[in-house]
Amino acid sequence: MSTHTARRAGATAGHDRDRGTEPGRTEFRRAMGLLPTGVAVVTVGSGEQTEAVTVGSVVSVSLDPALVLVSLGSTGRLVEAIDRAGGFAVNVLTTEQSDLSACFASHDRPHGRGAEERLGGVAGASGHVLLRDAVLSMECRTEHRYPGGDHVLFLGRVDELHTAEAAGSPLVHHRGAYTTLKDPC
């Protein structure tokens, strides 16, 4: 339950903004942190051309055709790399890969061969690095690119799908920290 004080008549707990007032960047970021998200590393290229970044915004868009959406900061190296390559790979991390998430979320993350070595992956059929122990890896071809405020949204057609049934639990980010899914039993 929120500790905010309601500012308008009829406001409910946690809903304290006057109508028409947009949230600030920090407030919106904190609010979105309440939404648990899976954690993935998006990769482009391999070898000297490897670029990678951690994302918490991967969305299944369509089953037929298989489409996913990823959201990337518009000023990042990965946007240009995807534009050049015409595609990307999405690697959903396990709880044992939180170190990779932290590494590729930093501004001084490795790229080129250093990124490929740190990821410990192999190039897939698309030429993009796939993480060996990821819960799921998808090789995608860019279908569309959309501006989205300070981000770019890439809609990717999934050409190759790699699942690791024996992989550990997926890494989850919630309230600014990594967490795990609880076993329902």
UniProtKB/Swiss-Prot annotation:
It is an enzyme of class 1 (oxidoreductase). Involved in the biosynthesis of the antibiotic asukamycin. When flavin concentration is low, AsuE2 assists the protoasukamycin 4-monooxygenase AsuE1 by providing a reduced form of flavin, enhancing AsuE1 activity. The keyword Lipid metabolism does not apply. Keywords: Antibiotic biosynthesis, Flavoprotein, FMN, NAD, Oxidoreductase. InterPro entries: Flavin_Rdtase-like_dom, NADH-dep_flavin_reductase, Split_barrel_FMN-bd. Residues 14-24 have a biased composition (Basic and acidic residues). The lineage of its organism: Bacteria, Bacillati, Actinomycetota, Actinomycetes, Kitasatosporales. Its EC number is 1.5.1.42. Residues 1-24 are annotated as: Disordered. One of its GO terms (biological process) is antibiotic biosynthetic process. PANTHER family: FLAVIN REDUCTASE, FLAVIN-DEPENDENT MONOOXYGENASE, REDUCTASE SUBUNIT HSAB. This is NADH-dependent FMN reductase AsuE2. Disruption phenotype: Mutant produces asukamycin in considerably lower yield than the wild type strain and accumulates major amounts of protoasukamycin. Belongs to the non-flavoprotein flavin reductase family. Pathway: Antibiotic biosynthesis. One of its GO terms (molecular function) is riboflavin reductase (NADPH) activity. It catalyses: FMNH2 + NAD(+) = FMN + NADH + 2 H(+). Does not interact with AsuE1, suggesting a possible transient interaction between the two enzymes instead of formation of a stable complex. It comes from the Bacteria. Residues 1-13 have a biased composition (Low complexity). The gene is asuE2.
